[in-house]
């Protein structure tokens, strides 16, 4: 086939899923001439699994993407059909937004944003090879002979790399939702020295909502006063569509047990490792044999369709078994399948080959983001895509990469876990993975990250102005509460305390200090603030942050002290050219891991599996010796 030069760019993004969209938009918005390529322009921002954005830890990621100037939060706010705040019975660290998406509208809106973005070209093409010369990216080739030149490349191919669809005895090469897999590109990555592994994920059947008996299920409506993912979005006032909760039965489980011999998962057909936190229904029935039922959520796929997603029933069982199994669920005895569930195997890049910037350690200008890095979930993908797009643009400009620490954001935790620790199964973001989760709440993502987004040029004037206005309101509100006092003789406060079964006052106290009591809320006390100035236009999120800062002040101070100690180790930098073979006393395993991972700091080195506390002590002594031998050169503060 005749090759021709089809174009020259600063950054090329391969794949237009959730990672690719964020990467391309970030790169273009930072001024880099960018091209995004996808197998099909119809699969842009596709949701091949659940029709939802957010949830525990994932909602935090979406808020952080938005605070930095990313797109996902804005798009889901415009296209959601339901939104709920989860975990409200727990502390604020784990409060999380989750939205049901109209999948097609979400795609159309993201396509509109991409097509109208300055500095961004879009192209439908099958990329077959990555061109690397002298250890640096030079461009890519497509199956039609087009060569696109660029010094930076972001690969966001999701589950398409050598994808294989599996439904019972049927298995064939394919990507999600019937799209083509990317086979030649996987071979090209191996040829240039990228280490690949094999993972598996799956999805449940989609069913016709007209054949579901919702009267036998429990309705799950959206919040009456829904919050937004984006700090820029107006309040959501559109009509919401409910989800429905039902359960499997003992009959369901018996059907599955009777057909385990036909399950690819248990017949040895599936080679890839599956996700721990999203197991198939057959896996759940085997692992939790004592459970008589499992929750099943019926979720609408959009406003103008009868297609419903059966959350909790991911499977690769044969289609005839899927039909029988689904019809044994409460309220689904007459259900009809629109699309069967399936498993998909795919290649992924071992993320320990990457720097914290998501650039490959050995191939300059090669970035990867999303499920190709071993993660699961749209939100994890989008977060990586944003950071890879930012750093690809900065790479082209010769600027230092943007790296968020574990104490900065869930995004920092996500990337540090992948690069430093690696993963042997599809990685899912969890609040429990974040050591400093009380500081990394979803409500304060803008306070943590918008200034960073502004400093690199991704946060525009409108967003920054809105952020500064909110910060000013918050400061004023805290001052107002700290300067408003009540005394034991105040009948209004006594009535409130009696109603809330709170201890009476014994001395004068500010309303801010009174708000520390767990049984009292902002809304309870606002009528007393400055003689009842309750009509001030206070943003509900500002009110929430005032309450959190009062109630959790002691814990926040303690956690900040932990962060300060953490940052001391993070700030002890390890030279990029450090020869660990010359550092005497390191354990053999520790030396091997340090050579392979190339940590940038003592803090990162301490999180590598196989590097012991003794190894860290030896590194600290070595760095101090080097500092004394060469004062002012490569020293450690």
UniProtKB/Swiss-Prot annotation:
Positions that bind NAD(+): 274-288
Disulfide bonds listed in the record: none
Binding-site residues for FAD, renumbered to this chain: 15-20, 127, 182, 371
Gene Ontology cellular-component annotations: cytosol
Classification via InterPro entries: FAD/NAD-bd_sf, GIDA_C_N, MnmG, MnmG-rel, MnmG-rel_CS, MnmG_C, MnmG_C_subdom, MnmG_C_subdom_sf
Similarity-based family: Belongs to the MnmG family.
Protein name: tRNA uridine 5-carboxymethylaminomethyl modification enzyme MnmG
Source organism of this protein record: Heliobacterium modesticaldum (strain ATCC 51547 / Ice1)
Name of the gene this protein is made from: mnmG
């Amino acid at each position: 086939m005749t090759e021709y030069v089809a174009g020259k760019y600063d950054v090329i993004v391969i794949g237009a899923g959730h990672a690719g969209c964020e990467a391309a938009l970030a790169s273009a918005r930072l001024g880099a001439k960018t091209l995004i390529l996808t197998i099909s322009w119809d699969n842009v921002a596709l949701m091949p699994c659940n029709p939802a954005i957010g949830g525990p830890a994932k909602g935090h990621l979406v808020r952080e993407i938005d605070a930095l100037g990313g797109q996902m939060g804005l798009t889901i706010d415009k296209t959601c059909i339901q939104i709920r705040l989860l975990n409200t019975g727990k502390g604020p660290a784990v409060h999380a937004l989750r939205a049901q998406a109209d999948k097609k509208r979400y795609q159309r809106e993201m396509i509109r944003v991409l097509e109208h973005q300055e500095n961004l070209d879009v192209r439908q093409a099958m990329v077959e090879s990555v061109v690397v010369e002298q250890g640096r990216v030079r461009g890519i080739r497509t199956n039609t002979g087009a060569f696109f030149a660029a010094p930076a490349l972001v690969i966001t191919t999701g589950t398409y790399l050598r994808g294989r669809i599996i439904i019972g005895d049927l298995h064939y090469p394919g990507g999600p939702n019937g799209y083509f897999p990317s086979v030649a590109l996987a071979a090209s990555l191996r040829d240039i020295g990228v280490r690949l592994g094999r993972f598996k994920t799956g999805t449940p059947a989609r069913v016709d909502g007209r054949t579901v008996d919702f009267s036998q299920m429990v309705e799950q409506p959206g919040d009456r006063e829904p919050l937004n993912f984006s700090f820029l979005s107006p309040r959501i006032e559109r009509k919401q569509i409910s989800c429905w909760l039902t359960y499997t039965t003992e009959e369901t489980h018996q059907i599955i047990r009777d057909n385990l011999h036909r399950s690819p998962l248990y017949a040895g057909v599936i080679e890839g490792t599956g996700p721990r936190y999203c197991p198939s229904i057959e896996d759940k029935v085997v692992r939790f044999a004592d459970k008589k039922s499992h929750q099943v959520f019926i979720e609408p796929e959009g406003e103008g369709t009868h297609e419903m997603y059966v959350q909790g029933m991911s499977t690769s069982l044969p289609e005839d078994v899927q039909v029988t199994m689904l019809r044994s669920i409460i309220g689904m005895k007459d259900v009809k399948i629109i699309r069967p569930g399936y498993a998909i195997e795919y290649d992924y890049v071992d993320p320990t080959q990457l720097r914290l910037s998501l650039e490959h350690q050995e191939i300059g200008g090669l970035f990867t983001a999303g499920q190709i890095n071993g993660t699961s979930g749209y939100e994890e993908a989008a977060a990586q895509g944003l950071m890879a797009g930012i750093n690809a643009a900065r790479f082209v400009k010769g600027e230092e990469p943007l790296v968020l620490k574990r104490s900065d954001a869930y995004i920092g935790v996500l990337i540090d876990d992948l690069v430093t620790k690696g993963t042997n199964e599809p990685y899912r973001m969890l609040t429990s993975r974040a050591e400093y989760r009380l500081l990394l709440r979803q409500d304060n993502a803008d306070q943590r990250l918008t200034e960073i987004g502004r400093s690199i040029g991704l946060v525009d004037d409108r967003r920054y102005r809105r952020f500064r206005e909110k910060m000013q309101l918050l400061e004023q509100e805290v001052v107002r509460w700290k300067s408003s006092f009540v005394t034991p003789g105040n009948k209004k406060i006594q009535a409130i305390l009696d109603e809330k079964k709170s201890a009476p006052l014994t001395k004068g106290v500010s309303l801010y200090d009174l708000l520390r009591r767990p049984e009292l809320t902002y809304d309870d006390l606002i009528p007393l603030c400055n003689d009842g100035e309750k009509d001030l236009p206070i943003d509900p999120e500002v009110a929430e942050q005032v309450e959190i800062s009062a109630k959790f002040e002691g814990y926040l101070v303690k956690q900040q002290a932990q962060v300060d100690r953490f940052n001391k180790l993070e700030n002890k930098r390890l030279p990029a050219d450090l020869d660990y073979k010359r550092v005497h006393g390191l354990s053999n395993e520790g030396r091997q891991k340090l050579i392979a991972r190339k940590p940038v700091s003592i803090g990162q080195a301490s999180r590598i599996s196989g590097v012991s506390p003794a190894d860290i002590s030896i590194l600290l002594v070595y760095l101090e010796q080097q500092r004394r031998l060469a004062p002012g050169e490569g020293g450690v503060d």
